[in-house]
Swiss-Prot record:
Disulfide bonds: 44-57, 101-214, 108-205, 113-164, 227-257, 237-249, 305-338, 392-449, 399-422
Protein name, as recorded: Envelope glycoprotein gp160
Ranges spanned by the short sequence motif Di-leucine internalization motif, renumbered to the chain: 858-859
Native organism taxonomy: Viruses, Riboviria, Pararnavirae, Artverviricota, Revtraviricetes
Molecular function as annotated in GO: structural molecule activity
Protein's gene: env
A GO biological process held by the record: fusion of virus membrane with host endosome membrane
Region (V2): 164-205
Length: 859
């Protein structure tokens, strides 16, 4: 027990020393390759040179590279700011292109309408349109079929148009006027009141404010890409198994811009996509059945739509300031239609096989026949879901896909065609928000458009026996496929980590490592490296970061200068201009934050703040900065507050230290501010002496009271008994003075002021003597101690010298022995090697000697 008691203080001492030595402090690193998810606006870039493209986007220079990163990152195509911005921006471009602007609420009146046919003499006659009968069976066409040119393929009819009459107030508000207008039958809701005429209204005119386009605009496809603003960058999952959601994508690349993509706006299918490959793959939502299927490019799938016939558009002025457009009927227009080219049946079979192999749908799909492509729509469904909706040269086509579905599903006893009849509507449901727009009647002349089919929008419902691929009207899903493998992140170059180095302590200098001058993405090349290796290059990385940010923001600045006039009045132009200052604002914000911690313009900044969580320590050899930041992000607020408090205290200490340092300059003693301080000091000394006098007086009065003695008739302050002074012998008694003052008595005393001065001098003398004796005693004791230590160390000098000499001699002997041993081993090795070589040569020569002996014998 005594043994442990004697060792306990030593153990406690060692624990205390180890705790002091191993204490961790917060170290601030600037320029680390770390990031966090961001939601800032992206910049649009395009190669289109038409007015629409140049007004909406910046010119694309095509100089964008990708860098492979050795990291793991999570990606989600549906929870993604890049895809959401694409949907919003394309809708904005869509509205800008076709822009409905005239309210048509006044046209919500009853109209008398009739289905109309015309003869060549323009004498219209009202008849009932007979439905077109279509024979059942298979009928496919190809590019050489003459019906394509003549628009006379089997089953295609004429567009149903209704001529309507209605009354409205014209320029005279109190007087009704008769108007005539022509509508597509699909845009009207009618009640059959007579045999040939109907009472009709515009569809949904009572539920929505409808607008008409001011002018007919083109909706041509626009190829564009997104670019990250300065200080941000894009990550892309480059894994071929990525299907819209992957929490751990290990094949990640970084870039400043996305790939080029097309502006798409259609239901059922995606056109001219950039993600199509020589395989079929599925993007699926993590929580529901929303999917988008990328179709195989091997089958060369395409769609060719056409609207035949000539049409004219004339204005109708209804009331003052309101102009509505109509089309006079010259001839019943032929029906618009779309032709599907390519090996569609095999493409759909491959889609089914892909679904069967997919791990999410294995439970329902047993074979290809159990997977069906269907169009599920109930009563009252939007026409964009019931029909395939697309935009062809500014016209909105609604195609009945029944023949097409029968063809690809190979349904017997049905009408199977590789083309679909379409009709054109003027009242359109908006695909991005709830609402309706009305557009001008179809443009004059023949319209046609061709597109490559690259994807299928669907909802996949699976049960125990079948799996249904239900086509969908979610236009936004197209951009999940195009940009779902990207994510926008913001660089966070400031990081915290614990080290055992405290501020202002001696630190071994770091070995400098040569770093190549890289661009902005080169800064991210170290993202997959260990923290220890990255910290060695922070100085160069921080310079690369700033230079890359400046270079990155210079690109939009240059292109903005080229198009300053066009960009002045556009929304996207304003967004692009705002992105210019993002980088500098971010850099200044980081430097201001570093300055508040006392780490301005430092790449590695040691502090005096203890590390708040000793259980969290980084693995400098195997952990990346991004992994470390994810572990300690919850400590950022606490560390930031501690660093700010430490910096405030440090500034106070530095201020006090500077005040002390100013005393050693002799000229500062004669400064005006110094004299003011001296005056203050003098006033304090006088006040102190007064207080000291009062205290001494009180103390002495108390002391005399304790002795029971006090001068009776002494004038205060009288500290001693009055000194008796005898009368002069030569002075006459009772001699009156010149003034008749009489005798002044036999005794008198010195004035009390002189006695007080004597007392004060005695006190001061005693104080100085005490200070002198104390200092002299302290110096003598110190000298005696030092002399004693020196005397005690004197005998040790000779043994220490002998010991040093012995150590040096021993080292020299070891070196000599090592040299001798090396030489001996080398000589022995050479001798052994030579002996082995000779023995080997002798063994090898045995067959030759035998042969030579035999030859001699035979000779």
């Amino acid at each position: 027990m005594a043994y442990f008691s004697s060792r306990l203080p030593i153990a406690l001492l060692l624990i205390g020393i180890s705790g002091f030595v191993c204490k961790q402090y917060v170290t601030v690193f600037y320029g680390i390759p770390a990031w966090r998810n961001a939601t800032v606006p992206l910049i649009c870039a395009t190669t289109n040179r038409d007015t629409w493209g140049t007004v909406q986007c910046l010119p694309d220079n095509g100089d964008y590279t990708e860098i492979r990163l050795n990291i793991t990152e999570a990606f989600d195509a549906w929870d993604n700011t890049v895809t959401q911005q694409a949907v919003d921006d394309v809708w904005r471009l869509f509205e800008t292109s076709i822009k409905p602007c005239v309210k048509l609420t006044p046209l919500c009146v009853a109209m008398n309408c009739s289905k109309t046919e015309t003869n060549p003499g323009n004498a219209s006659s009202t008849t009932t349109t007979k439905p077109t009968t279509t024979s059942r069976g298979l009928k496919t066409i190809n590019e050489t079929d003459p019906c394509i040119k003549n628009d006379s393929c089997t089953g295609l009819g004429e567009e149903e148009i209704m001529q309507c009459n209605f009354s409205m107030t014209g320029l005279r508000r109190d007087e009704l006027k008769q108007y005539k207008d022509t509508w597509y039958s699909e845009d009207l809701e009618c009640n059959n009141t007579r045999k040939y005429t109907s009472r009709c209204y515009i569809r949904t005119c009572n539920t929505t404010i409808i607008q008409e386009s001011c002018d007919k605009h083109y909706w041509d496809s626009l190829r564009f890409r997104y670019c990250a603003p300065p200080g941000f960058f894009l990550l892309r999952c480059n894994d071929t198994n990525y299907s819209g959601f992957m929490p751990n994508c290990s094949k990640v690349v970084a870039s400043s811009c996305t790939r080029m993509m097309e502006t798409q706006s259609s239901t059922w299918f995606g056109f001219n996509g950039t993600r199509a490959e020589n395989r079929t793959y599925i993007y699926w939502h993590e929580k529901d059945n929303r999917t988008i299927i990328s179709l195989n490019t091997y089958y060369n799938l395409s769609i060719h739509c056409k609207r035949p016939g000539n049409k004219t558009v004339v204005p109708i002025r209804t009331v003052s300031g309101l102009l509505f457009h109509s089309q006079p009927i010259n001839k019943r227009p032929r029906q618009a239609w779309c032709w599907f080219k390519g090996n569609w049946t095999e493409a759909i079979k491959e889609v089914k096989r892909t679904i069967i192999k997919h791990p999410r749908y294995k439970g329902g799909a047993k074979n290809i026949t159990s997977v069906k492509l269907v169009s599920e729509h109930g009563k009252g469904s939007d026409p964009e879901t019931t029909y395939m909706w697309t935009n062809c040269r500014g016209e909105f086509l609604y195609c009945n896909m029944t023949w097409f579905l029968n063809w690809v599903e190979n349904k017997t006893n049905t009408t199977r065609r590789n083309y679909a009849p379409c009709h054109i509507r003027q009242i359109i449901n908006t695909w991005h928000k709830v609402g309706k727009n009305i557009y001008l009647p179809p443009r004059e002349g023949e319209l046609s458009c061709n597109s490559t089919v690259t994807s299928l929008i669907a909802n996949i419902n699976s049960d125990n026996s079948t799996t249904n691929i239900s086509v969908s009207a979610e236009v936004s899903e197209l951009y999940r496929l195009e940009l779902g493998d990207y994510k926008l992140v913001e660089i966070t170059p400031i990081g915290f980590a614990p080290t055992d180095v405290r501020r202002y302590s001696s630190v071994k200098p770091r070995n400098k490592r040569g770093v190549m001058v890289l661009g902005f993405l080169g800064f991210l090349a170290m993202a997959g490296s260990a923290m220890g290796a990255t910290s060695l290059t922070l100085s160069a990385q921080s310079r690369t970061l700033l230079a890359g940010i400046v270079q990155q923001q210079q690109q939009p600045v240059d292109v903005v200068k080229r198009q300053q006039e066009l960009l002045r009045l556009t929304v996207w132009g304003t967004k692009n201009l705002q992105a210019r200052v993002t980088a500098i604002e971010k850099y200044l914000k980081d430097q201001a934050q570093l300055n508040s911690w006392g780490c301005a313009f430092r790449q590695v900044c040691h502090t005096t703040v203890p590390w708040p969580n000793e259980t969290l320590t980084p693995n400098w050899n195997n952990m990346t900065w991004q992994q470390w930041e994810k572990q300690v992000h919850f400590l950022d607020a606490n560390i930031t507050a501690l660093l700010e408090e430490a910096q405030i205290q440090q500034e106070k200490n530095m201020y006090e230290l500077q005040k002390i340092n100013s005393w050693d300059v002799f000229g500062n003693w004669f400064d005006l501010t110094s004299w003011i301080k001296y005056i203050h000091l003098g006033l304090y000394i006088v006040a102190g002496l007064v207080v000291l006098r009062i205290v001494v007086y009180i103390v002495q009065m108390l002391a005399r009271l304790r002795k029971g003695y006090r001068p009776v008739f002494s004038s205060p302050p009288s500290y001693t008994q009055q000194i008796p002074i005898r009368k002069d012998r030569g002075q006459p008694a009772n001699e009156e003075t010149e003034e008749g003052g009489g005798n002044d008595g036999d005794y008198r005393s010195w004035p009390w002021q002189i006695e007080y001065i004597h007392f004060l001098l005695r006190q001061l003398r005693n104080l100085l003597i005490w200070l002198y004796n104390g200092c002299r005693t302290l110096l003598l004791k110190t000298f005696q101690i030092l002399h004693q230590i020196s005397t005690n160390l004197q005998p040790l000098r000779l043994p220490v010298a002998y010991l040093q000499y012995g150590i040096s001699w021993f080292q020299e002997a070891l070196r000599a022995a090592a040299r001798a041993t090396g030489e001996t081993l080398a000589s022995a090795g050479e001798t052994l090697w030579e002996a082995l070589r000779r023995a080997a040569r002798a063994i090898i020569a045995i067959p030759r000697r035998i042969r030579q002996g035999l030859e001699l014998t035979l000779l």
